[in-house]
Regions:
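Non-heme Fe(II) oxygenase catalytic core, chiefly the N-lobe of the double-stranded beta-helix
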Residues: 1-138
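Catalytic core of Fe(II)/2-oxoglutarate
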Residues: 124-170
Length: 170
C-alpha cells in the first residue's frame, strides 16, 4: 500500500479531476483456493451488485473517517469509486462485467444487508430486466484500469451506481 495507494490517488485525481481522494481499503480477489489459503484475499463476486446504497454510502464514510473528516466529505458532492485492475496476469477467466447505467432502472436495485463481525453494511443486488445492456473487458492487462462508481451523493447525475460483478468466461 505504500506505493500503490499514492499511485491510485494520483491516477484518480488525473482521470476524474477531483481534488481530494481518500483510499480506505482494498480487496484482492483470487479464484484459486490454494492462493487464497491463509491470505487476506477473497473470491471474485459472481453476483451482480453495487457496493453501496443510499444508506450505506454515507455510513461507510462515517465508519472509515473521523467525525470531522466525514462531515467535511458528506457536506459536499462525493463519490465512492472502485479501481478494478488485474494484478500480475491478465483477467480473462473471471473478467469484470458491468451494465450500461442508462439501461438499469431504479427498481432493478434491491437493497440487501451485509452483516460482518464488526459492522453492518448494505449493498444493492441487481435484478435482471429486459433492456439492460452489459459489457466486459476481455483479457484485461495489469496496466489497464476500470473505474466503477459505486456511490454518488449527487441525485441528478446520470449514473449514481454501477451494477457489476464477474462471470466465468469459458
Amino acid at each position: 500500500t505504500g506505493i500503490y495507494y499514492p499511485e491510485i490517488d494520483a491516477f484518480l485525481k488525473s482521470a476524474t479531476g477531483v481534488t481530494s481522494v481518500h483510499i480506505f481499503d482494498h480487496t484482492i480477489r483470487v479464484q484459486d483456493e490454494g492462493k487464497r489459503t491463509g491470505k487476506q484475499v477473497r473470491l471474485p463476486v459472481a453476483t451482480i451488485h453495487n457496493d453501496y446504497t443510499e444508506w450505506s454510502g454515507p455510513k461507510r464514510v462515517r465508519d472509515v473517517m473521523s467525525e470531522a473528516e466525514a462531515e467535511r466529505y458528506l457536506s459536499h458532492r462525493f463519490a465512492m469509486v472502485n479501481v478494478w485492475r488485474s494484478i500480475g496476469v491478465s483477467a480473462e477467466r473471471l473478467p469484470v462485467v458491468m451494465a450500461d447505467a442508462r439501461t438499469i432502472r431504479p427498481d432493478d436495485f434491491v437493497a440487501s444487508d451485509l452483516v460482518y463481525q464488526d459492522r453492518k453494511g448494505e449493498i444493492f443486488q441487481v435484478r435482471h430486466s429486459m433492456g439492460q445492456e452489459w459489457f466486459y473487458f476481455p483479457d484485461m492487462q495489469p496496466d489497464e484500469v476500470v473505474l466503477l462508481k459505486c456511490f454518488d451523493n449527487a441525485t441528478d447525475c446520470p449514473a449514481r451506481y454501477t451494477a457489476h460483478g464477474t462471470f466465468e468466461n469459458p
